[in-house]
């Protein structure tokens, strides 16, 4: 599979753009820049709901997200700008023709860097035969660890508890946090795990079906991009892989162009560069 990349970038940030061009040329990846939204210069707000039903859906998503501790309590303008910038790419991918419906496109933020190219071509070729909506090629946290006996017992308990539960979205998400929250072995894959609650939007593959699902979950810019990934996973309708090798990293030299600097610094303090 020959990669084509979309990179979100503020046109005013030529240093980042030049950095990305060098990284793409190093990896031999065809690329296109998508003009990012700057939430520091304007107050980015979501469009209003088009119907009562849509507003009810958004309210339920918010209520369910707040029941899981690691989701933010909404987003500020800079974070909504980040979400909207990724959504511009998702929309582009969601509109590809049927001939390209199974194609994975690489999505990058403009602080990505290339860590490893060895084995990438083989991994990409295998990805075409796997049923993932999205695949992390770079991520923070959520690395694979073999399950402990306690964790296996927890999964059995939560499956049983689900059979007796009221089947609410909150109950479903709490169950799936145990069942799907950690990286898991993919029995048919040499190069990928099933992803759990990992982090990062700097380098991921996305196909048409995955893009359409993400757009439906984050119409009101409720989530940062990687929060939308995790919410979709916990809803049980979004299949995500993660490469065993981290092919792409996140270069901290630039700070943050799309989110608040305070938020960006706190994130990288929690998840230092690999």
Q: Model-derived features: where do they sit?
A:
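An acidic/histidine-cluster motif and surrounding catalytic segment
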Residues: 1-108, 112-274
């Amino acid at each position: 599979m020959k990669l084509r990349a979309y990179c979100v970038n503020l046109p005013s940030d030529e240093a980042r753009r030049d950095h990305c061009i060098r990284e793409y040329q190093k990896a031999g990846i065809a690329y296109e820049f998508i003009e990012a939204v700057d939430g520091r210069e304007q107050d980015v707000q979501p469009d209003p709901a088009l119907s009562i039903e849509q507003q009810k859906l958004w309210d339920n998503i918010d209520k369910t997200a707040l029941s899981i501790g690691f989701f933010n309590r909404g987003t500020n303008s800079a974070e909504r700008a980040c979400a909207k910038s990724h959504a511009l790419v998702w929309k582009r991918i969601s509109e590809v023709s049927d001939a390209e419906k199974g194609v994975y496109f690489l999505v990058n933020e403009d602080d990505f860097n290339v860590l490893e190219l060895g084995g990438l071509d083989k991994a990409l070729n295998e990805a075409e035969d796997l049923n993932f909506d999205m695949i992390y090629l770079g991520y923070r946290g959520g690395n694979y660890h073999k399950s402990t006996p306690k964790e296996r017992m927890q999964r059995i308990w939560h499956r049983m508890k689900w059979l007796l539960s009221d089947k609410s979205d909150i109950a479903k998400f709490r169950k799936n946090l145990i069942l799907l929250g950690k990286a898991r072995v993919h029995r048919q894959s040499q190069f990928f795990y099933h992803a759990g609650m990992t982090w990062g939007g700097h380098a991921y593959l996305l196909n048409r079906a995955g893009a359409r699902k993400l757009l439906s979950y984050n119409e009101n810019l409720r989530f940062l991009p990687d929060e939308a990934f995790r919410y979709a996973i916990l809803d049980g309708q979004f299949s995500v892989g993660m490469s065993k090798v981290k092919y792409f990293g996140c270069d901290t030299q630039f700070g943050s162009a799309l989110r608040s600097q305070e938020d960006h610094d706190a994130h990288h303090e929690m998840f230092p560069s690999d």
